[in-house]
């Protein structure tokens, strides 16, 4: 029998990302309002269980009756297998995980996190920012080609799986406007399986591929491509570390494995709203000018922050590119309706389901209230890392140059299209 209520979000039993405990629910409707007004899903679908897996409801629920699908038992099972454990960590996790261990908001625990993952059994720990650099290389080229041919504009980013599912559910006529690029974690998953395994004389079945993410919808995303075995949220990782009596705050720092390389600082800011846009525009500048940007594109303040919709016009080598950054799929709905009515025009649009981007993802530590001060501290920690690094553009990264020279050949090659791109589907 279906358990449907008009006072809360309704979560199906087979939801791959989110679970619901009815016994804890007092039907306060906070989750419903978040899903309706911020996420733009509740009340817009005829489905009994409409969900884009973002997990915003899990952060808003004061009773914790909504939560991520806990897969720490599966994590433990994998860690005790006889297979090679390969992990990757998304950018936003490093500036939020410390909160679960009493550290100050926005503390960057990258080195301690890597040590913790090796302590619990990871054989290799890679940085998802390398996958973000791959995304930038492919997406910047895709954008330049679309602008030159005036086809399939505006181009929307495709890094956020909840936004992609939102588009598939409600605006299938715009699926061709989505970038065909996979997200950074999915690009990394594909590269681990098809490049890392090859150069290490491993078969896909010899490894367990695990990603640590700020986002519940990554649990849904990995089911689409089968390149990754398990997606563990920041909250789940903290829970498992505490179970193993590992105090993150007391660990020493260590570094990512270098075989797949570390990403540029542009990959780091993928974890915050506007970061995908900023990193991509840096590479667009490089493509059109044949040199690397300085000034504004390395500190693009007008597209940073947590405002619902941000706009800018960028002039690069005579080409004017009008861009928008959207915080929340609820606002994406409003902007798309304006585009349909020809009230506004853009060339490139970044959409993140969660306000502030991945730093506010549905798998992040629960902090009440989840206010702008918290988001800004996490966000600023990522921008601080961006500012202090020397390699700030994807194509400046020597490891990116190596993988294109040794495996992909060139941006947009047949091999790139096979492993780094995808086709979006109609969910109607």
Describe the residue ranges of each PLM region.
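Iron-sulfur-associated redox domains of electron-transfer enzymes in respiratory
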Residues: 68-428
């Amino acid at each position: 029998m279906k358990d449907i209520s008009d006072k809360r979000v309704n979560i199906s039993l087979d939801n791959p990302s989110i679970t619901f405990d009815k016994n804890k629910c007092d039907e306060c409707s906070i989750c419903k309002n978040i899903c309706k007004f911020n996420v733009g899903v509740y009340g817009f679908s005829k489905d009994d269980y409409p969900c884009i897996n973002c997990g915003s409801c899990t952060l808003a629920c004061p009773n914790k009756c909504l939560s991520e699908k806990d897969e720490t038992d599966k994590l433990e099972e994998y860690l005790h297998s006889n297979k090679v454990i390969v992990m990757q960590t998304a950018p936003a996790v490093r500036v939020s995980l410390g909160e679960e261990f009493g550290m100050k908001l926005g503390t960057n625990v990258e080195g301690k996190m890597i040590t913790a993952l090796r302590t619990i059994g990871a054989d290799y720990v890679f940085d998802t920012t390398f996958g973000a650099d791959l995304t930038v290389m492919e997406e910047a080229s895709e954008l330049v080609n679309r602008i030159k041919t005036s086809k399939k504009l505006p181009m929307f980013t495709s890094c956020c799986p909840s936004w992609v599912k939102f588009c598939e559910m409600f605006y299938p006529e715009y699926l061709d406007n989505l970038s065909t690029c996979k997200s950074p974690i999915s690009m990394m998953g594909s590269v681990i399986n098809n490049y890392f395994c090859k150069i290490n004389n491993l078969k896909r079945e010899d490894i367990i591929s695990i990603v640590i993410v700020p986002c519940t919808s990554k649990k849904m995303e990995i089911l689409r491509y089968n390149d990754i075995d398990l997606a563990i949220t920041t909250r789940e990782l903290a829970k498992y570390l505490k179970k193993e009596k590992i105090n993150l705050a007391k660990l020493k720092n260590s570094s990512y494995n270098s075989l797949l390389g570390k990403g540029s600082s542009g990959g780091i800011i993928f974890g915050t709203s506007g970061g995908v846009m900023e990193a991509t525009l840096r590479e667009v500048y490089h493509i059109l000018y044949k040199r690397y940007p300085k000034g504004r594109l390395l500190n693009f303040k007008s597209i940073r922050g947590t405002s619902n919709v941000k706009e800018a016009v960028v002039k690069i080598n005579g080409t004017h590119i009008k861009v928008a950054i959207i915080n929340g799929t609820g606002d994406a709905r409003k902007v798309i309706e304006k585009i349909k009515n020809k009230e506004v025009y853009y060339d490139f649009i970044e959409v993140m389901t969660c306000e502030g981007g991945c730093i506010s993802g549905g798998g992040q530590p629960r902090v009440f209230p989840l206010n702008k001060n918290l988001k800004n501290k996490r966000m600023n920690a990522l921008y601080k890392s961006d500012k202090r690094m020397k390699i700030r553009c994807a194509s400046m990264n020597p490891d990116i140059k190596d993988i294109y020279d040794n495996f992909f050949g060139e941006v947009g090659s047949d091999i790139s299209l096979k492993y780094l791109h995808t086709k979006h589907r109609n969910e109607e």
